[in-house]
Amino acid sequence: MAKTLYEKLFDAHVVYEAENETPLLYIDRHLVHEVTSPQAFDGLRAHGRPVRQPGKTFATMDHNVSTQTKDINACGEMARIQMQELIKNCKEFGVELYDLNHPYQGIVHVMGPEQGVTLPGMTIVCGDSHTATHGAFGALAFGIGTSEVEHVLATQTLKQGRAKTMKIEVQGKAAPGITAKDIVLAIIGKTGSAGGTGHVVEFCGEAIRDLSMEGRMTLCNMAIEMGAKAGLVAPDETTFNYVKGRLHAPKGKDFDDAVAYWKTLQTDEGATFDTVVTLQAEEISPQVTWGTNPGQVISVNDNIPDPASFADPVERASAEKALAYMGLKPGIPLTEVAIDKVFIGSCTNSRIEDLRAAAEIAKGRKVAPGVQALVVPGSGQVKAQAEAEGLDKIFIEAGFEWRLPGCSMCLAMNNDRLNPGERCASTSNRNFEGRQGRGGRTHLVSPAMAAAAAVTGHFADIRNIK
């Protein structure tokens, strides 16, 4: 029987499936951070259980770390306790930890792929919703809750029901300057923020194949923002070239054998999907969200929509509420909307390719008066690479703040946050009310678009910036 990539990955990991019961899946990799793990380790301790497979468990600190100092005390009492607990737990249970002073420390979904911890064909979980990022490698990756974190630590397995399947095909080639972030925002604009609920999404089509691994990670990272369980891109030569030679990747003949298997991780011809969505890549322009969910998105050249134009009463009410929170009036051009802060970072857009794209816009320009702009590399490795290329100097010269790795202003769990009423052009993944700080107003954009907003003081079409 013809199978989708998701069905192949799922079936290959079923440990046990009794009739009328939820299947038990084997988990190949478990990524751990300081926020969702303390209670899980306490649960192990209470029952006298070890971590079943410490060699398949990798930990780092990211959510509430300071991006200005490596001092564990810098972000308050709760952050300090969570980080100290992680240090204690990893030591006690034999789990490898990339702490604040480790060169590999960084956002968990940046660190995993760059260390070769993430490989095609794997099942990967983490107590974090954006675990879907790793699906870019043709791995089944999804976020889990803290009680499930404990279950995986104890057994290296997890009960999981089968999801529905969705194919999103982006046909043709994207125009110059259009990034994975623009593509995924355009997709969510079409499906809505709940369009993928109950599904695992496979992204395909020429525009997807053309993306680098960094771009594919951006894409899969935001699958969760359309309500999907996970996102997938089938592995190909781009994937294999990225993985080859990385720290935890197979070497020599083992790598060749792995690639032979990875090449089978494609959706079979004739396999059927529960839902199919198609977009034309050439129709996608730079995207900017205007509301309070990622599906409320328009082209940079559009005007702020009028809630009255929505036929669906639920959408209309949602748009009215969003505009009131965002402090925007219907009909005004998006390019006239001024911003207060810019955040370039997060597990969506903090990799080297993202920083290069932002630096290209920032080079030889200055951050607009009254704007604070942060650039937060996704990991110690990304930071070192960017500095080797001189990107930090470009940003600093332009008036951006060059920070230490961490989740930073993506979420209000550390010192980097918006004040009430402040408007931010952000490369992160969520624009809910209060996501970046109470009363903060978030607009999601690509790294180049964020840099353009920083230097102009408002949203600007990067295609017009020479």
Swiss-Prot record:
It comes from Shigella boydii serotype 4 (strain Sb227). Heterodimer of LeuC and LeuD. Its cofactor is [4Fe-4S] cluster. Pathway: Amino-acid biosynthesis; L-leucine biosynthesis; L-leucine from 3-methyl-2-oxobutanoate: step 2/4. The lineage of its organism: Bacteria, Pseudomonadati, Pseudomonadota, Gammaproteobacteria, Enterobacterales. Binds 1 [4Fe-4S] cluster per subunit. This is 3-isopropylmalate dehydratase large subunit. Keywords: 4Fe-4S, Amino-acid biosynthesis, Branched-chain amino acid biosynthesis, Iron, Iron-sulfur, Leucine biosynthesis, Lyase, Metal-binding. Belongs to the aconitase/IPM isomerase family. LeuC type 1 subfamily.
